[in-house]
């Protein structure tokens, strides 16, 4: 779905939810690390992401969602592709992803949406992530 379109667009009788998120990487003591988040509502480990606001570009959505969920202000480094799946409400969802680098830590505050963050090695992330689609995304950007 093109940037700047409505969050969800009717395609016949199917509504596709548009979202964006980030794979945030840094150099750590054990090499390259990536940030994963725990969502208590689903009891899952994934990458930070969320639905786009109407009129919001995918890039702006990804940066906003990462900031809201993690407290990190980031720089987009490169596009990381797209994942498509059916969400918990049964709607088709398309998520555009970017590799990001943290610039500033605005402070994480655990909340109902994300209650824990972990910086983990790429190998540990592959074991911790709940969804195969996230592991496949991680493999594409190694």
Feature names for model-found ranges:
Residues 46-49:
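A short gly/proline-enriched turn/hairpin at secondary-structure junctions
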Residues 27-33, 89-91:
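Short, solvent-exposed loop/turn segments that connect beta-strands within catalytic domains
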Residues 35-38:
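Short, acidic/hydrophobic/Gly-rich beta-strand patch recurrent on exposed beta strands
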Residues 1-23, 29:
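Acidic, metal-coordinating catalytic segment for phosphate/diphosphate chemistry
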Residues 21, 33, 116:
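Conserved beta-strand and immediately adjacent loop positions that scaffold enzyme active sites
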Residues 42-44:
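A short, flexible beta-alpha/helix-coil linker loop
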Residues 18, 33, 94-98:
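Short beta-strand micro-motifs in enzyme catalytic cores
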Residues 52-140:
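Unchanged
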